[in-house]
Amino acid sequence: MKKMILIAGPCVIESKDLIFKVAEQLKNFNENPNIEFYFKSSFDKANRTSINSFRGPGLEEGLKILQSVKDEFGMKILTDIHESNQANPVSEVADVLQIPAFLCRQTDLLVAAAKTKAKVNIKKGQFLNPSDIKYSVKKALQTRGIEDEGYEAAQKNGVFVAERGSSFGYGNLVVDMRSLVIMREFAPVIFDATHSVQMPGAAGGSSGGKSEFVEPLARAAAAVGIDGFFFETHINPCEALCDGPNMLNLTRLKNCVNTLLEIQNIIKENK
């Protein structure tokens, strides 16, 4: 049976101590034979609303901490890059390079990521027609010498895409579940359940969010039939230094993931 992809971890590396505490609580997912698990955290949040917002420890220290998670817990790592020159050093640690939603059309960034040995996760921009993500996927595939298109070509060559909501007026996002079906024509699809409930800039210099909708939307995405899920999670989201309002508390993640596995099994049995 095909494994469900699960990407989870704190939004940003706040400290090595916090990262290890979260990784300790996520290790059961890494050991689950039905899950392909990736630990996620960012070394630099370069697109924060305010210049005064916490960004993370930076490239050098951040990669050391992510490598220590890999060494201690045997987890694969996903982290995002914002500049082309970050691709090579980050790929020495990360198994997946993530392209931020705001940068999903940036050719140089996509090409730099695709030139590495890492997989590439392209987050669909909040502004983007879901069918247009195919052009970003093609940039990555053609960089890897692949002229074929479609789901199978992307899957075989380590390229997948993520839905994280679409702009719905000012300071709000909405999830169009049709996007999951459309994007899956071009690549494996991950549903970013936590950023999809974000309210950009709604907290006055930072983003707000409605975390009570994370689990219902994740269940809906599972019922559509996709490849995996992305959750930013924290021991205490209220104290998180980034994206706390839309994070899922670690205490809720286990039951949520178990439910998603059950839904996916039902979908597979009825196809």
From Swiss-Prot:
Superkingdom per UniProt: Bacteria
Pathway stated in the Swiss-Prot or TrEMBL entry: Carbohydrate biosynthesis; 3-deoxy-D-manno-octulosonate biosynthesis; 3-deoxy-D-manno-octulosonate from D-ribulose 5-phosphate: step 2/3; Bacterial outer membrane biogenesis; lipopolysaccharide biosynthesis
GO molecular function: 3-deoxy-8-phosphooctulonate synthase activity
InterPro entries: Aldolase_TIM, DAHP1/KDSA, KDO8P_synthase
GO BP, sorted A to Z: keto-3-deoxy-D-manno-octulosonic acid biosynthetic process
Localisation per UniProt entry: Cytoplasm
Keyword annotations of the record: Cytoplasm, Lipopolysaccharide biosynthesis, Transferase
Entry keyword annotation includes Transferase: yes
EC number: 2.5.1.55
Catalytic activity: D-arabinose 5-phosphate + phosphoenolpyruvate + H2O = 3-deoxy-alpha-D-manno-2-octulosonate-8-phosphate + phosphate
Classification via Pfam families: DAHP_synth_1
Classification via SUPFAM superfamilies: Aldolase
EC class name: transferase
GO cellular component, one term: cytoplasm
Xref: PANTHER family: PHOSPHO-2-DEHYDRO-3-DEOXYHEPTONATE ALDOLASE (PTHR21057)
Family: Belongs to the KdsA family.
Protein name in the entry: 2-dehydro-3-deoxyphosphooctonate aldolase
Protein species of origin: Campylobacter jejuni subsp. jejuni serotype O:23/36 (strain 81-176)
